[in-house]
C-alpha cells in the first residue's frame, strides 16, 4: 500500500494542477477503502475503482462495496467494469442504482457489450453521471450510444488524435471521428496483442518515456510484436 500511495503522490507532484484520478480498487472492501482514503489524503481529485475480482460477489455485494467507499471518502468515484479480468459483470440495474449516489460520478465500461453500455447511458441520462469507454476500439461506438468520453490506453501514445476523435464524436462530427478511429485502429490492435499493459509500456519506451520493465509474472513484449509497434 505504501508504494501504491507513493505512486499517486509522485504523479500529483509531476502534473502540478492537472486533475489526478487514482486507481484504488481491490478485491475486498476494507483494502479498497484504505487505498481510497490514502489517495484522498495524498491529494487525488477522484477515484477509479475496479470491481472486486476473483471472489465474484453478488450484485448486492457490489452495491454495498461501492456505497461504503463513496460514503466514507469525499471524492468523486468512477466504477470500473471489466468482467474479462474480474470474473463478475456489473449489471445495468446495479450501475443505475450506484449512479444515484452523489459521490459516484461515472462508469468505465470495458465489458465489450455495447447493448449494456447503451442501456446504462440511457437510464442515467438524468443523473450527473459519465459513461466512459474503457476499450479504445469501442470508444467511438460507446459515444454513439450515449457515452461521454474515454479512459484510454492509446492516449498514452497518441493523446492528440485520441482527444480529437472523442471531441469530434461529442460534437456530432462522426465523419471526422470515424476517420480518426480508422487511423488509430492499427494502434488500438497493437496495444492489445498481449496483456495490457505490456504493449503500451513497450510503446512508451519506444517513444522515450522510460524502460519497459515489468514485474513478474508479467514479461516484456514478445520480439515478434516489437517491430510492428515501432
Language-model regions: role of each:
Residues 51, 79, 87, 111, ...:
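Generic secondary-structure boundary/loop-capping signal
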Residues 72, 83-183, 188:
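Catalytic alpha/beta core domains of metabolic enzymes, predominantly
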Amino acid at each position: 500500500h505504501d508504494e501504491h500511495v507513493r505512486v499517486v503522490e509522485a504523479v500529483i507532484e509531476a502534473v502540478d494542477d492537472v486533475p489526478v484520478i487514482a486507481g484504488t480498487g481491490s478485491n475486498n472492501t476494507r483494502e479498497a477503502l484504505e487505498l481510497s482514503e490514502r489517495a484522498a489524503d495524498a491529494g487525488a481529485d477522484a477515484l477509479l475503482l475496479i470491481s472486486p475480482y476473483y471472489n465474484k460477489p453478488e450484485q448486492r455485494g457490489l452495491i454495498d462495496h461501492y456505497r461504503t467507499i463513496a460514503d466514507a471518502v469525499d471524492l468523486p468515484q468512477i466504477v470500473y467494469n471489466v468482467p474479462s479480468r474480474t470474473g463478475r459483470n456489473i449489471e445495468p440495474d446495479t450501475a443505475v442504482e450506484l449512479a444515484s449516489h452523489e459521490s459516484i460520478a461515472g462508469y468505465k465500461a470495458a465489458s465489450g457489450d455495447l447493448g449494456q453500455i447503451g442501456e446504462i447511458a440511457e437510464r442515467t441520462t438524468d443523473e450527473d453521471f459519465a459513461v466512459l469507454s474503457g476499450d479504445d476500439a469501442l470508444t467511438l461506438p460507446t459515444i454513439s450510444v450515449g457515452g461521454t468520453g474515454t479512459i484510454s490506453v492509446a492516449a498514452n501514445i497518441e493523446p492528440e488524435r485520441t482527444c480529437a476523435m472523442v471531441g469530434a464524436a461529442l460534437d456530432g462530427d462522426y465523419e471526422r471521428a470515424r476517420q480518426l478511429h480508422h487511423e488509430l485502429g492499427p494502434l488500438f490492435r497493437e496495444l492489445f496483442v498481449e496483456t495490457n499493459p505490456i504493449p503500451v509500456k513497450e510503446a512508451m519506451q519506444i517513444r522515450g518515456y522510460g524502460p519497459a520493465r515489468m514485474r513478474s509474472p508479467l514479461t516484456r513484449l514478445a520480439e515478434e510484436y516489437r517491430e510492428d509497434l515501432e
